[in-house]
Amino acid sequence: MQTYDSGIPTILIWLFAISQILYLGCFLLEMYFRSLKVNSVDMEDPLPATEAELPFIVLLYPVLRELERTMETTFTSLAKLDYPRSRYRVVAIPNANDTETIASLQRLTQTYPFVEILEVPATTDPRWDVVWNAWDANPKAYWWHNGKRAGSKDLPPKKTRQLIYALYQVAQTHRDKTHLTIDYIDADSCPPADHFKAAAIGLQKYDVLQARNVAGNLNASLAAAFHAFDHMTWDGAKYGHLSDPKQPFWVLGKGLFFKVDDLIALGGFHPWITIEDPEVGERFWKNGKTLGIIDSSLIEEVPETFDEGVTQRKRWVAGFFQSLGAPLKEMDFTFGERVRAWMNFLPCMSLWVNTLGIPLGVWAAWRFFTGDNALPLWLVVLSVFNIIAFTVLMVGLYMRTWTRTGLVLERTTDRIGYMLMVNPIFVMIWWCAWIVPLTLGFVMYLKDSGQVWQRTEKIDANNTLVRSKLDQFGVLRHDH
């Protein structure tokens, strides 16, 4: 093997150089995102002048084999919503064959009578005809007209199918309603009291609204700390920049608002993608719709074990790959638009670079400090620049994370404890471990799997937190 004078194998130097060039690319991508403006809903803006002009909001609650106590915690938060009762509905949408969840919901409606239940039947049921007829007439529902599943009514029995059925039922039931809007959340999502008010303000300016999320059980385990940190990094920091009209946007899958007329006109939800979030956002962006960010955060729970975290993340990764392939062509994205759409995924996908860069960085540092460094000068300069850039970015991220921990942790000692769990060394190891869900998700994409709802188990992890926060504040403090 060819070596430099110091005896360092040339292949290691080249690998180190590649890793540093990739790190520079990641930094430049980060700078691009930071150059994009964040379009936030200004809660100081006025509401519509009269109650009749407020959006009529139908909150959809898709559930599958959920714990009754998890749903009860969510309903506790929904009971605190500060919005005229005549201007919203809360509709749980279990599958019709999920008898255990339906029984739990029926018991809970005795305590929370504002909750309605809409059972989602099998797609052979004639009540689905409203969907098929709408898709027949709408070329925006390209999956129905083109591809290997064109015309297939055998939709996979997961969250997206529930949302599709409920969307068209809501549109049919409330044809006479002005400003008809849907919002949907996950089984464990607990919105703040001003969630609907934020929508009423924001929908006067934006077409789609997305609330931020914060994990409440971030101190439950080391795995939970890392999973919550992923949300701190993406949901709490980078995501808001996707609201710049220049950048194709995704949605986060809960705590978001669509105008029903827009969603119907654009074909509803794509049933054949593992997660619906990226594709529907891309479709809205391509059709000129704008995104606004609601800074008041939903409380959610994150997986408390690494196994559950991998299951969740591989599903995300598969959906990202799926949404960035054929759908972009079907939606007539130009090459430049496709590149920008891929940029949304690159911060996640680039985590694999750490599995190469971190060990090589340790090796290069060791050689340097032992006085046996033969790296080219340009590579030394690039490495120093990357270290400085990385340090600056991490300081900013940790400052942001410290601020957001205050949304759910009252005691300073708890906040410090969390920051210690997500210290830079542990985070580096975690980012290396991301190679596992990235690989598994890519395999899912290649196999066209992910059609079955691979659930992330919800364990009512935020029971006490949600009740104390809602009782104390009625609404979470905003994080700007």
Annotate each language-model stretch with its function:
Residues P94-L108, P121-D129:
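A conserved acidic beta->alpha catalytic loop
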Residues E282-I299:
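Catalytic donor-sugar/metal-binding loop of nucleotide-sugar-dependent glycosyltransferases
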Residues F56-V58, R89, E279:
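Cell-envelope/extracellular polymer assembly enzymes that use nucleotide-activated donors
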